[in-house]
């Protein structure tokens, strides 16, 4: 009913209403309505996340570069790289002819994170009683403020997916690395911060799971609606940058 009313208003004002427009209208309504939530209340999601932060026993201690396990500093270039040649490398760059920058023409030199083939940043989407929900996780990273931030279903570099670290393949990776997956809602390469990363981009994805498919969800994952994600963005250092990037498509 609401979608049809908005559609009529747009058409009366000369807008071209196509399938993409209808999808955008549905997404807009999805992002502003709380009564559609079918699983967890917003308060429950906030309390769940805060509890996960309290339960996290990860500690982070700053150490010297030479004390890093399995990371090497080149004696010739000073570049820092992993012994597997995966993950990333710290290189130096010289930037010149920077007329449009604050420093003027002289340019500058700086270290950059390079040789990172990128990875997959993916959100699983599943409809419960017809309402889209997104599977997110409370993920700990050593550089996070508060240790944990709300992250996508899958946040994995190519090295992670190839198990270069010797560990397990990330959970739910099978939903995102299937080339013939017909349930892909969105899949595009998007660049990282070019001031810190050298020629890096990640494959941002939203993949829909069939409503009748049962998933085994660990307790550090939770289903949330788009409305809830938008509300959680009002809380400082709660929603990580990768989720913010993916949902910008919606």
Positions of PLM-derived features:
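N-terminal domain-onset segments
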Residues: 1-99, 234-250
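Extended, Lys/Arg-enriched charged tracts that mediate electrostatic binding to polyanionic substrates
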Residues: 60-118, 122, 173-190
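Generic structural hydrophobic/aromatic packing signal, biased to beta-strands
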Residues: 90, 134-136, 154, 205-208
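Core of folded catalytic or high-affinity ligand/protein-binding domains
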Residues: 95-155
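An exposed acidic His-Trp-rich patch
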Residues: 134-195
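Elongated scaffolding segments in large macromolecular assemblies
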Residues: 187-250
């Amino acid at each position: 009913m609401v979608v049809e009313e908005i559609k009529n208003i747009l058409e009366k004002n000369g807008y071209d209403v196509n399938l993409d427009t209808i999808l955008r209208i549905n997404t807009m309504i999805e992002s502003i309505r709380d009564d559609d939530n079918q699983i967890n209340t917003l308060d429950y999601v906030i309390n769940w996340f805060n509890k996960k932060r309290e339960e996290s026993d990860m500690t982070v201690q700053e150490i010297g570069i030479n004390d890093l396990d399995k990371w090497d500093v080149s004696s010739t270039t000073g570049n820092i790289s992993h012994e597997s040649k995966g993950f990333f490398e710290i290189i130096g760059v010289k930037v010149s002819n920077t007329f449009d920058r604050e420093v003027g023409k002289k340019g500058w030199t700086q270290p950059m994170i390079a040789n990172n083939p990128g990875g997959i940043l993916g959100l699983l989407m599943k409809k419960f009683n017809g309402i889209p929900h997104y599977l997110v996780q409370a993920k700990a990273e050593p550089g996070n403020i508060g240790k944990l931030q709300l992250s996508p279903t899958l946040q994995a570099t190519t090295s992670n997916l190839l198990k270069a670290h010797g560990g397990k393949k990330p959970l739910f990776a099978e939903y995102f690395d299937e080339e013939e997956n017909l349930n892909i809602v969105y899949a595009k390469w998007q660049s990282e911060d070019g001031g810190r990363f050298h020629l890096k981009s990640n494959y941002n994805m939203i993949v829909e799971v069939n409503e009748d498919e049962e998933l085994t969800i660990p307790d550090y994952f939770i289903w949330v609606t788009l409305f809830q994600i938008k509300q959680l963005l009002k809380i400082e250092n709660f929603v990580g940058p990768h989720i913010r990037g993916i949902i910008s498509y919606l």
